[in-house]
Amino acid sequence: MTDTSSSISRKSLRADSYQPQLIEEKWQNEWKISGLYKTREPKEDQKTFYALSMFPYPSGNLHMGHVRNYVITDVIARVHRMKGFSVLHPMGWDAFGLPAENAAIERNIQPDIWTEKNISHMRSQLDRLGLSIDWDREQTTSKSEYYKWTQSIFLKLYEAGLAYQKSATVNWDPVDKTVLANEQVDADGKSWRSGALVEKKQLKQWFLKITDYAEILLKDIDTLTEWPERVKTMQSNWIGKSVGVKINFQLLTKEKENLSVFTTRPDTLFGSTYLVLSPEDKLVDKLVDPKLINDLSNFRDYVSKLSDKERTAEGKPKNGMAIGAYAINPINQEKLPIWIADYVLSGYGTGAVMGVPAHDQRDLDFAQKYSLPIKYVIKPSGIIEKKKEVKAYSEVGVMINSGPFNGQKSDEVKSLITEKGIKENWAEKKTTYKLRDWLISRQRYWGCPIPIVHCAKCGIVPIEKENLPVFLPTNIQLSGKGNSPLKDNEWTKTQCPICKGIARRESDTMDTFICSSWYYLRFIDPNNKKNIIDKNLADRWMPVDQYVGGIEHAILHLLYARFITKVLRDKDMISIDEPFKKLLTQGMVQGITFKNPKTGKYIPPNKINNIKTPLDPSTGESLELIYEKMSKSKHNGIDPSTVIDKYGADTARMFILFKAPPEKDLEWDDADVEGQYRFLQRLWRLINESKTYNKLSLDSNENNNLNNLNQDEISLRRSVHLAIKEISNDLNEGNQFNTAISELMKLSNNMNELLGKCRISVVNESLSILIRILSPFAPHLAEEAWSTLKGKGSVHEQKWPEFDPNALKQDNYQLVIQMNGKVRGSIKIASETNKQEIEKIALNSDIAKKWLIDGSYKKVIVVLGKLVNIVY
């Protein structure tokens, strides 16, 4: 007989109202005072877990993209803390860069003051989200105690021959007045920040020799088993390895110099009918016919206005000019004209290309445009040779018009021609990469100073390590025009470290991506005054276990961080090969836009009378409703503070996590935000109704009294422990927060129905588990509930619950029956029924008989405990 002395009657109870703002402010203050989220020194044999979001630029305000990033990381950190890991979850600021300098110019304020003000505001915004951040480890890249070590890394690169200065054609942003790396120019040839059409300039610049690490960066992509395939593919393509042959064409000049061309298709050498150089190549000045110098100058002016991406874009017409010079094809001694063309870039391969129009579509288009010869040397196997072809043939086939190689397979001839060239000393095997050295010079003030001085006597001289940091001067007059603001400043005047004579400091500052290429290391050892990081601490915490950030950083930041990690490893400062073990690239947060399809104009929502049938207030034309990335220009941004003020941080967190899987784009929906708020209100009522009758704490010994349960208690325990199992699986397998919250909703519904029919022991166990598995998602409500029900300590210090397999056992369950994969009904079946018996029962069911003709079927698929699928 069931003991009902402690059963609960809930009908007469009134729940307190849910007031998230009061609860959240209370617990945020409490967590700060208690230092709850400080990183604890790992105990002996305790596992560590490093959870990190890509740190933000301090623009002054968080946007919903930030919120999604940081909440995702926070949930992961909280769950691992409850699972017994020593967790490191820090935050910092990627504070150098153009926006702060431009804002300072506009407002007539120094960038450091502007930046610190923004950091202070954004830190308070992050606190309002209830993030479990260890603020004692906060880092700001624009502070000298941080950039001292950025400069130290630069010196290590310089000592290793990996940092160098050279004159180069660079991408110039005419609006921001600075140089851009190739990666910072979009497909339309525009600056990634200002949107201005990028120009070309010849300037002396600092580079990092990332190309020395191209092969290992490519090879180690295979070790990144917990990175998205999309990111790995993007990096692999960017590195762009090509294995081929360097072929020397002898120039018809007095000196008889060679022009080197790299190709992956030596089998097409007989089909080469012209050679193409980059317009910027210095050899062009030497080879050009004097009569064509003006034409050359005009062509170079035209090319200087194009970005590299514009010049090489597929489908775009290619332009060129003959320069009046010739070279000899080494395979057949034919005389080939030399051209320059916009599609050949000086930094790729050898800067020269052999034109094989019959077997390369781009070369064919160019040859047809300028009436250059087209010579076919490969034909498809078994196909009769045609006299005239209009399409390039780029596949393997049979050699023709190729002297002694005629009739042989083209893929076999590749090696034969290569060996012939090596033997005759006009070819060599070579591997090239699309990846180019990292240009780090920036002609702006607000960046990390490059620790180099220029001496008329000693040349380029690095600053001594003991004299770091080279401080960025203060109170600089910023105009935003021309060269670096530091160039003509008194600050540049210094003494040469070698000869002690007059010297000049380097006036360029570093690309901000250098600052962010190593910050994850400094969080581990933030107060180390002797080294960047203690190697033992690095071994303990690295690599970052979970890194979270946007897909837009797939090439820039992530590739640079991998490069710097490998350099520091080679310098024996750290032991790891890769910085980030697991990478999650969250999708964008999108808002609804109202767009006039005819004009392309975006209309603010507050200008529209009827949202359901929106019209342009100016023209009366119908508007398109489209979800797009949130931005001011599209009038679809949502201020996180507004949402928190109205609904609370827990609601904002729950919506962000529930609306879409983390890697997918999220469409903002006010109705769904309301839905999450109502769910938390229901949970609040459930918990508050519980506290009025629950005189035992969550830690009561009566929790152990789980024998002789009635059917309602069995059902509740099964629901609770199934939720533990499913939510744990959702979090372990792909961070599926949306399905985890769905399980929470199911559990709360079942508890709402069954709590009043159960004894205190079952109620306490159920509430304890509910609050614990809720806590990573809605930390404030969970903490208040835990405190209200007199749980010991903080809920965030409790163990993550483990499910009881015995609680999941059932005498019977509903077996879903599918016919050809579609659900057609279900039948009750005994839990111990095996696969063979299930198959028989399913085939004899009324459901199966209804769909099977003459009882015939192809196969039966049984998933024990869940479903059977009959394929017919």
Curated annotation (Swiss-Prot):
Motif ('HIGH' region): 56-66
Cysteines paired by S-S bonds: none
Enzyme nomenclature, EC number: 6.1.1.4
PROSITE patterns: AA_TRNA_LIGASE_I
GO cellular component, one term: cytosol
GO terms assigned for molecular function: aminoacyl-tRNA deacylase activity; ATP binding; leucine-tRNA ligase activity
Binding sites annotated in the UniProt record for ATP: 632
Segments crossing the lipid bilayer: none
Protein localization: Cytoplasm
Chain positions of motif 'KMSKS' region: 629-633
One biological process term in Gene Ontology: leucyl-tRNA aminoacylation
Signal peptide range in chain numbering: none
Keywords: Aminoacyl-tRNA synthetase, ATP-binding, Cytoplasm, Ligase, Nucleotide-binding, Protein biosynthesis
Record's keyword annotation contains Nucleotide-binding: yes
CDD domains found in the cross-reference section: Anticodon_Ia_Leu_BEm, LeuRS_core
Catalytic activity: tRNA(Leu) + L-leucine + ATP = L-leucyl-tRNA(Leu) + AMP + diphosphate
Listed InterPro entries: aa-tRNA-synth_I_CS, aa-tRNA-synth_Ia, Leu-tRNA-ligase, Leu_tRNA-synth_edit, M/V/L/I-tRNA-synth_anticd-bd, Methionyl/Leucyl_tRNA_Synth, Rossmann-like_a/b/a_fold, tRNAsynth_Ia_anticodon-bd
Protein's UniProt keywords contain Acetylation: no
Database matches in PANTHER family: LEUCINE--TRNA LIGASE, MITOCHONDRIAL, LEUCYL-TRNA SYNTHETASE
HAMAP family cross-referenced by the UniProt entry: Leu_tRNA_synth_B (MF_00049_B)
Family: Belongs to the class-I aminoacyl-tRNA synthetase family.
Entry protein name: Leucine--tRNA ligase
Source organism of this protein record: Prochlorococcus marinus (strain MIT 9211)
Name of the gene: leuS
